[in-house]
Amino acid sequence: MTLVNPSEKLILALDGMDVLEALSFIDKVPDLIWVKVGLELFATSGLEIFTELRARGKKVFLDLKFHDIPNTMAGACYRAARNGAELITVHACAGSKALLVANEAAKKGAASVGLPSPTLLGVTVLTSWTSYEFGDELDIHHSLEKRVEHLAQLAFKAGLGGCICSPCEVKRLREIFPESFELITPGIRFLDSGLDDQARVMQPRDAFTSGASRLVLGRIITRSTNPAEAFTRVCRDIQTD
């Protein structure tokens, strides 16, 4: 399969930047479509970053990983969708009730301003966890992989549009879930890149051919001396025959 527009499958994380830095950076990557607004950027910019990104024709992936009681999660997702977030993360371990009401609230929020329904994504297990740390520190006695699978099932049954997982779990999850259930993965590195604080990583092409729907790119782009060239490199890498 050859992708018509590989840029649509890539999401750039602008962590560690303020609004001006983020906007300046995306101008360096003209083919960029999706931008991830995480905790750091949102904490410094608030909703201003939504307005600025959408004015530039970018799609917003709001990655705040909401995890609270159902009513609070519903309110947060309603407002996020109303402000134009097209992908929104929630922790799957918040439970079925919270996932169900958050998903419905997001649809209502978008509809209230004439926007299409966003896709809610259930966060499974953060890619910074190793299998040993996961079991030892959280005192969980089944495998990390089983936990990821269980949380992905919760998200799927609650009607969410996909989940966040490491590239190491993508192949197994794709065997379980249909293509319509998005598997979005951070932890993307080339062999000549460092691991930084990620523990479960994979190269772009390998993650994509394993079944990932979209890839979240961070430091392999933001730390590059030529971000546009680095982005193009990933686009070429995920093109499959």
From Swiss-Prot:
For the keyword Metal-binding, the answer is no
Biological pathway: Pyrimidine metabolism; UMP biosynthesis via de novo pathway; UMP from orotate: step 2/2
Alphabetically list the UniProt keywords: Decarboxylase, Lyase, Pyrimidine biosynthesis
Q: Where is the active site?
A: K65
Which Gene Ontology BP terms does the record give?
Answer: 'de novo' pyrimidine nucleobase biosynthetic process; 'de novo' UMP biosynthetic process
What residues does substrate bind to?
15, 36, 63-72, 127, 189, 198, 218-219
Any GO MF annotation of the entry: orotidine-5'-phosphate decarboxylase activity
Q: Which residues form a coiled coil?
A: none
| Xref: SMART domains | OMPdecase (SM00934)
The catalysed reaction is: orotidine 5'-phosphate + H(+) = UMP + CO2
**Gene Ontology annotations for the cellular component aspect, listed alphabetically:** cytosol
Report the EC code(s) recorded for this entry: 4.1.1.23
Q: Which family does it belong to?
A: Belongs to the OMP decarboxylase family. Type 1 subfamily.
Any idea what job this protein has? Catalyzes the decarboxylation of orotidine 5'-monophosphate (OMP) to uridine 5'-monophosphate (UMP).
Question: How is the subunit organization of this protein annotated in UniProt?
Answer: Homodimer.
The protein's name is Orotidine 5'-phosphate decarboxylase
Q: Which organism is it from?
A: Prochlorococcus marinus (strain MIT 9211)
Gene assigned in the entry: pyrF
